[in-house]
Amino acid sequence: MRGILLAGGTGSRLWPVTRAISKQLIPVFDKPMIYYPLTTLMMAGVREILVITRPDDQRQFRHLLGDGSQLGLRLEYAVQERPEGIAQAFVLGAEFIGDQSVALVLGDNIFHGAGLGTRLRQYNDPAGARIFAYVVADPKAYGVVEFDEAGRAVSIEEKPARPKSRYAVPGLYFYDNRVLDVVHGLVPSRRGELEITAVNETYLKWGQLRVTTLDRGTAWLDTGTFASLVQASEYVRVVEERQGLKIGCVEEVAWRCGFIGNDQLRDLSRPLLKSGYGRYLLDLLADHEELKEVKPS
């Protein structure tokens, strides 16, 4: 499976903050926003990832992430000249996807929860499409999915006036390779965009749109407004300070997933020591070595 991280768009809901910088590069507490969706793909076992950016932003993303080799990844980049819908990501990424299945994550969506990576890895070779469902207070503001007890989608609507369920569809999607054919046949919506809901509707018609609920132990944070951005930062701060563990730490996730070894993690920590971020990485290694030295009684 290959991954696409969509970090384009104008970010106009966050202007003037995002007039000169990509939304996905602004901080969510102690990390750039893009670290969080990137680690979501990594936890799903995806190591080949296409990062789609605005033309003016690509240089900064390359400076931050490079080619991904330091994290055991292969990162490539594509430019979104104009934002023409979420499903445009598959048009821009068609050559990168090739004959593989693909996971798409939106660059302003943050997921966190115990066992999330284990669950995501179950779906990294989908037969059809896999979307996720999350209970929200106001489903009218989201894409809404209705599904049966077996996890088969029954209906899906974009911002319905009368929602058929309280389950919103977060910005994380898994598709088999037929998604490229689906997108090729899409007609732009009235707002001139290739809609991700239209992609999902096609799989629904085929009877191959599966739904996994994200339970109450999982947080889904959308950072598209000033208020939600502050809330996301506060959530990350509180969890990290109480648990002593970081959320969305790309170096830690690469290490825990086995993409890099101890020496690579140690090398990555050194330039980050002044902020305390590097000390956290070194402490992970120290704790790991301590556990290895403990002998069973």
UniProtKB/Swiss-Prot annotation:
| Function in brief | Catalyzes the formation of dTDP-glucose, from dTTP and glucose 1-phosphate in the novobiocin biosynthesis pathway, an aminocoumarin family antibiotic that targets bacterial DNA gyrases.
Gene (name only): novV
The protein's required cofactor(s) are namely: Mg(2+)
Q: Please identify the protein, giving its name as recorded.
A: Glucose-1-phosphate thymidylyltransferase
One GO biological-process annotation of the entry reads: antibiotic biosynthetic process
Q: What is its EC number?
A: 2.7.7.24
Could you list this entry's UniProt keywords, alphabetically sorted.
Answer: Antibiotic biosynthesis, Magnesium, Metal-binding, Nucleotidyltransferase, Transferase
Q: Does the keyword Transcription apply?
A: no
Q: Which terms in the Gene Ontology molecular function aspect does this entry carry? A: glucose-1-phosphate thymidylyltransferase activity; metal ion binding
Please share the entry's free-text remark on the cofactor.
Binds 1 Mg(2+) ion per subunit.
Xref: NCBIfam families: rmlA (TIGR01207)
Broad EC category: transferase
Q: Which family does it belong to?
A: Belongs to the glucose-1-phosphate thymidylyltransferase family.
Instruction: Please name the SUPFAM superfamilies in this protein's record.
Output: Nucleotide-diphospho-sugar transferases (SSF53448)
**Tell me, what's a Pfam family for it?**
NTP_transferase
Q: Per the record, what are the reactions this protein catalyses? A: dTTP + alpha-D-glucose 1-phosphate + H(+) = dTDP-alpha-D-glucose + diphosphate
What pathway is it annotated to? Antibiotic biosynthesis; novobiocin biosynthesis
Q: Would the keyword Magnesium be found if you checked this record's keyword annotation?
A: yes
Instruction: Please tell me the species this chain comes from.
Output: Streptomyces niveus
